[in-house]
Amino acid sequence: MILGSTGSIGTQAIDLVLRNPDRFRVTGLSAAGGRVGLLAEQAHRLRVSTVAVAREDVVPVLREALTAQYGPGEPLPEILAGADAATQLAASDCHTVLNGITGSIGLAPTLAALEAGRTLALANKESLIVGGPLVKALAKPGQIIPVDSEHAALFQALAAGTRADVRKLVVTASGGPFRGRTKAELANVSPEHALAHPTWAMGPVITINSATLVNKGLEVIEAHLLYDIPFERIEVVVHPQSYVHSMVEFTDGSTLAQATPPDMRGPIAIGLGWPERVPDAAPAFDWTKASSWEFFPLDNDAFPSVGLARHVGQLAGTAPAVFNAANEECVDAFLNGTLPFNGIMETVTRVVEEHGTPRTGTSLTVADVLEAETWARARARELTVQTATAEARA
């Protein structure tokens, strides 16, 4: 099953599957519903039995698009529609669910896949971050295979030792399009500038999260949850070339780094094929050519998101859900031109502070997470409106 099939992760996963028909067979696809033509084309090429869309209003258009793709007499796939369509699909019969949905709406499908006993290839980091204790309570050892390039790298490097052998995890960051700029220089950057990522081709929300380094903050929380390494032993370094995807430093002083040219098909292949490797899943280095690999410390003043993420990760409970939801609203406001770039983290910080002590412990429920998210989104919207009004008067 591929959830989020028309997005960046989904389309690259399908490319990998089509190049390896002897290894993979896809039985279902899900998408939000904004690209029904592409969804219908994917369904036909993969011969899936079920497609799911979040938007019920696009079902007639989707059915028409499917009819145009399939020949006379060919049975059309079953269509699931509605807010819980992807969750239904995630729980249906298959071996592996690739969750490539963007945002915390991926939580319910993640929980459904785990509860149904599926192997979860997890690209939707938000579901683990906002539902940490809930996800970990359901997941059996080895059931979650991370698809983020950084966590796929850690996943492979950690196999070289035991948890007791690990001194620290080193998560690398490209630094985004604004690497080297000061906080003052970031004040007036535009969405167009922020969307021009120097290394990776991603969707708009993830690209902005990479520009603010919120994405890296989320990855620090994710690394803590996946590998049970304390936050003080998870380090972030800037690596502009994005060749080294993460590193593990062991207690004997050795460091294992996983390195490939930046191409998400590599981590996707790990998620779908593990414990086997998929030959030629992504390009390899030409080691006969000279290249420079640079590493720099993180500028926490210009990019306070990683420090804030550590803070909410340590608070745990509903705090990560508040952080993520507020950020999603602020990113939307920035893309719409109603919030300045630096205003994203300023607003998220204020929402986290106003949230106060999060609800934590074994009593945490999905309802608690959703309630915290709803409050955070509403409060973030209020604050972005106040910011826009103040700037208009200035």
From Swiss-Prot:
Q: What is its EC number?
A: 1.1.1.267
Q: Which UniProt keywords apply?
A: Isoprene biosynthesis, Manganese, Metal-binding, NADP, Oxidoreductase
Q: Which cofactor does it need?
A: Mg(2+); Mn(2+)
Q: Which InterPro entries match?
A: DXP_reductoisomerase, DXP_reductoisomerase_C, DXP_reductoisomerase_N, DXPR_C, DXPR_C_sf, NAD(P)-bd_dom_sf
State which pathway it belongs to: Isoprenoid biosynthesis; isopentenyl diphosphate biosynthesis via DXP pathway; isopentenyl diphosphate from 1-deoxy-D-xylulose 5-phosphate: step 1/6
Gene Ontology BP, a term: isopentenyl diphosphate biosynthetic process, methylerythritol 4-phosphate pathway involved in terpenoid biosynthetic process
User: The organism sits in which domain of life?
Assistant: Bacteria
UniProt keyword Metal-binding present: yes
Return the similarity comment: Belongs to the DXR family.
Xref: PANTHER family: 1-DEOXY-D-XYLULOSE 5-PHOSPHATE REDUCTOISOMERASE, 1-DEOXY-D-XYLULOSE 5-PHOSPHATE REDUCTOISOMERASE, CHLOROPLASTIC
- What the protein does? Catalyzes the NADPH-dependent rearrangement and reduction of 1-deoxy-D-xylulose-5-phosphate (DXP) to 2-C-methyl-D-erythritol 4-phosphate (MEP).
Protein name (database record): 1-deoxy-D-xylulose 5-phosphate reductoisomerase
The gene for this chain is dxr
